[in-house]
């Protein structure tokens, strides 16, 4: 009897796990992959989308920033561990060092091949860019792309869009744990980073507007 009870509990656990996975794939993952982005932004083609086809990871997130591209761009090109930070959860993604609210002149140069540290041991690099418009990051093996894209709405507002695309195999036991962690942890960190860029760029825009008003 006790053995049958254990079997029944195991069956219930398996069913619950399967239901959770189904709910995640059906409802949570589509929202996670498109947080803040409009249907048009999700379906739009961006630079280097043709780097590879049918990626397993294809996430497009966006936020509206009350600032011009030139007020947002400086905060993007200085991102990185030990640099400006990730404007997110500093205790986790910047070694406990607070992300800066300022534009750092020493990190305002950008060129193809420039590294952006993810941690003390890993980094992505700039694969290509168009000044004040977009910046593409690549991994060392060129397996994935990470695009930052600035789309002006009007004279004082810009859509900040990020698109991440990657290939991986769910059947690979060596990669699966990392991908599960990425699936569950990426959105909170990406959302926090986008909102961090937004807050800093809008602060800069307010300061510049006040200075212009005082000077005028």
Regions found by a protein language model. Name each.
Residues 107-110, 128-137:
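Short, hydrophobic/aromatic-rich segments at coil-to-beta transitions
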Residues 98, 196-216:
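Short, highly charged C-terminal tails/helix-capping segments
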Residues 66-70, 128-132, 149-159, 199-206:
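A short, structured loop/turn motif at beta-sheet edges
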Residues 58-60, 121-122, 142-148:
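Short, surface-exposed coil-to-beta transition loops
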Residues 35, 42, 139-199:
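Beta-strand/loop substructures that line and gate deep hydrophobic ligand-binding cavities in soluble
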Residues 1-12:
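Membrane-penetrating hydrophobic segments
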Residues 16-109, 123, 215-216:
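Hydrophobic ligand-binding cavity/cleft-lining segments
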Residues 81-82, 129-133, 143:
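Short, charged/polar surface micro-motifs in flexible loops or helix N-caps
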């Amino acid at each position: 009897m006790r053995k049958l009870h254990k079997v029944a509990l195991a069956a219930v656990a398996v069913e619950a796990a399967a239901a959770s996975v189904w709910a995640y794939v059906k409802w949570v993952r589509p929202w996670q992959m498109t947080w803040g982005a409009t249907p048009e932004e999700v379906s739009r083609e961006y630079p280097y989308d043709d780097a590879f086809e049918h990626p397993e990871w294809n996430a497009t997130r966006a936020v509206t920033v009350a600032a011009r591209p030139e007020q947002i761009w400086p905060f993007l090109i200085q991102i990185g561990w030990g640099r400006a930070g990730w404007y997110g959860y500093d205790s986790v993604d910047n070694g406990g060092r607070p992300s800066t609210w300022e534009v750092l002149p020493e990190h305002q140069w950008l060129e193809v091949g420039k590294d952006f540290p993810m941690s003390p041991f890993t980094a992505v690099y700039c694969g290509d860019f168009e000044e004040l418009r977009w910046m593409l990051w690549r991994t060392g093996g060129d397996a994935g792309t990470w695009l930052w894209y600035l789309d002006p709405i009007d004279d004082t507002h810009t859509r900040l869009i990020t698109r991440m695309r990657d290939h991986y195999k769910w059947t690979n036991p060596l990669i699966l744990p990392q991908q599960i962690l990425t699936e569950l942890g990426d959105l909170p960190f990406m959302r926090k980073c986008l909102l961090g860029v937004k807050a800093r760029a809008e602060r800069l825009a307010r300061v510049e507007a006040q200075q212009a008003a005082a000077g005028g």
